[in-house]
Amino acid sequence: MKMTLIAILTCAAVLVLHTTAAEELEAESQLMEVGMPDTELAAVDEERLFECSVSCEIEKEGNKDCKKKKCKGGWKCKFNMCVKV
């Protein structure tokens, strides 16, 4: 009787560990899929950074005060760079 109980508990523990590992793998794969657009967002961020600093340099060359370019979509220009607000 004790051996049967031990066998059942062991199987249950293995099943729980296997299920947990499978859930972690599934969550990890979903994060990888969601993470793919981050590279595209990084490219957009670099473009915004470039646009902001270039516009400020152009204004400085004209012997005018550097008026920071207003960035759109939750971004602002700070230290000649677009930063997320």
Swiss-Prot record:
It is found in: Secreted. It comes from the Eukaryota. Residues 1-22 form the signal peptide. InterPro entries: Hwtx-2-like. Residues 23-48 form a propeptide. Keywords: Disulfide bond, Neurotoxin, Postsynaptic neurotoxin, Secreted, Signal, Toxin. One of its GO terms (molecular function) is toxin activity. One of its GO terms (cellular component) is host cell postsynaptic membrane. Expressed by the venom gland. Disulfide bonds join 52-66, 56-77, 71-82. Belongs to the neurotoxin 12 (Hwtx-2) family. 02 (Hwtx-2) subfamily. Monomer. Neurotoxin active on both insects and mammals. This is U4-theraphotoxin-Hhn1a. It comes from Cyriopagopus hainanus (Chinese bird spider).
